[in-house]
Curated annotation (Swiss-Prot):
Transmembrane segments: none
Leader sequence segment: none
Pfam families: Cupin_2
Protein name in the entry: Uncharacterized protein SCO3923
Organism, scientific name: Streptomyces coelicolor (strain ATCC BAA-471 / A3(2) / M145)
InterPro entries cross-referenced by the UniProt entry: Cupin_2 (IPR013096), PKS_Associated_Protein (IPR052044), RmlC-like_jellyroll (IPR014710), RmlC_Cupin_sf (IPR011051)
UniProt superkingdom: Bacteria
Amino acid sequence: MKAFRLDELEAERAANDGAYLQFLRERNMSVGLYALDAGTTDSQKPHAQDEVYFVVSGRAAITVGMETTQVARGSVVYVPAGVAHKFHHISEDLRVLVVFSPPES
């Protein structure tokens, strides 16, 4: 078993000065913590993997392809591989668990 605490993951991510911390990588999936502060820009490009976002905290909008929705704590969003997507109108610091399948390269 592997178990993680969000507060420890956030501290590690912040200490490494990055918006993204991959903390689990297995044969069929990887998981990371993505952080975007209020007012910042999400510069993601489409990925070759399917993704699931689980919003841990914060508020924003996300556009996936041509669809836009508001997200906040507890929101779950699926993004198919190869589809353009980004968070925007980030009104509260956003922390998101990201699951990639297959694992992100």
